[in-house]
Amino acid sequence: MEITNLLEFSHRAQLRDWFERHAATDKECWIAMYRVKRPAECSGCLPYIDVVEEALCFGWIDSTLKRLPDDRLAQRLSPRRKHSHWTELNKQRCADLEAQGLMTDMGRQAFALAK
């Protein structure tokens, strides 16, 4: 699978802004990120939890993970399909995000199909 539409964000709010503008129309994106700890030299990447939580807020899901040449990772995100499998962890994350007021209508619709 080829990495296309690689996006780099320094802050979670930038990713959320991208989702607000593109979640309803785009079919996929790849997000530059790191998995555990943020290296001091890693600008233009987000932690995994920020990426997955924002994706869930808009009804998207993370899937394929690839290593980039500079040792960062690229996480593929795409809209959830109607009858896709939801892990209990992601169901709990959605409930937590809803309680924080972060879920969008798109995210709520995707989550409602999982119940």
List PLM regions with ranges:
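Charge-dense, helix-prone N-terminal extensions
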Residues: M1-K115
